[in-house]
Amino acid sequence: LPVEITWWGHATATVRDSGVRVLTDPLFVARLMHLRRRRGALPPPSAAIADVVVVSHLHSDHLHLPSLARLAPGTRLVVPHGARAAVPGLRRLAAVRGLPVTEVRPGDEIAAGALTIRAVPAAHDGRRWPYGTRTAPALGYVIQGEARTYFAGDTGLFDGMARAVGACDVAMLPVGGWGPFLGHGHLDPGRAAEALAELAPRAAVPVHYGTYWPIGMDAVRPHEFHAPGDDFVRRAAALAPGVAVHRLGHGESMRLEAAR
C-alpha cells in the first residue's frame, strides 16, 4: 500500500502508513499569541483523527494544548521526556481527555500498530518559553512501516544528522518557520537542502512555512512568508537532484509507493 502524507500547515501533517494514522505537532487555530494564520483554511475536524500523535518539542506552536484537546479519547501522545513535568497543563489535559502519554528520549522506539516510531535528536531549543527553565529535549521522529518517514520537527543542521536518522524514504523538513530571522536551531531553505543531500531520501515534503506569520509582517515582508517553499524546491534540485520534492498546498497530499 502507498504511504500518504497530508500537510495541514505549519508542522502539522498526517502520515498514513500500514493502516495507522500518525499526526505531527497538531496546531488547529487561526491565531496563536502574535501569530495569525495567513494562508490555508483551518484543517477540518477530520484532521484531528489519529491513532498516535507525535510532538517534537515544547514550543507552543508545536505542543499546543487547545489543539490536543480536540483529539478523541484514547489517542496516544508521544512527547519528549520531561514534557509532563515541564508543561503541567499537558498532564491535566491528558487525564481529563483520556489521552495516554508516552515520553521518549532520542533512540527510544515505540510500537504503534504495525508501525515502529523512533525518536531521534534535533538541534533546537527545548524550553517551553524563551527565558524559562522548563525544558525537554527537542526531537524528530522516524515512522517506519511500509516506508520510513522522517519528521524533523524543528531543527538545525547538526553533525551526525544522517547517521542519527538512518535510511529514510521521505523527509519532512522545516524550511521556513514564522519569522524572518531564523538563526541557530532552524533550517532555512538552503540549510534544509543541505540536510536533504545528507539524508538522501526518495522524496521530501517541505513543512513549517507559509502558514503563520506575525501580525502585520505579511504586509511588510511578504516575500519572506511565501518564498521558502519555492526556494527549497530550487535549492534541493541543485543539491539533491535525485530526490522528488513535493511542495504541497495546505490540505494537499502526496503518496509514495512502498519500496520493493
Give the residues covered by each predicted segment.
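Beta-strand-turn-beta hairpins that frame and shape the catalytic cleft
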Residues: 1-4, 16-22, 109-118, 144-149, ...
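Active-site-proximal loop/helix segment associated with metal-binding centers of metalloenzymes
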Residues: 30-31, 118-146, 155-160, 170-172
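Active-site metal-binding loops of divalent metal-dependent hydrolases
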Residues: 26-28, 58, 82, 120-124, ...
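Metal-dependent catalytic neighborhoods of phosphoester/phosphodiester hydrolases
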Residues: 64-74, 88-93, 215-228
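Pre-active-site segment of Zn-dependent metallo-hydrolases
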Residues: 14-58, 62-70, 79-82, 126-131, ...
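Cap/insert and terminal regions of metallo-dependent hydrolase folds
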Residues: 85, 158-250
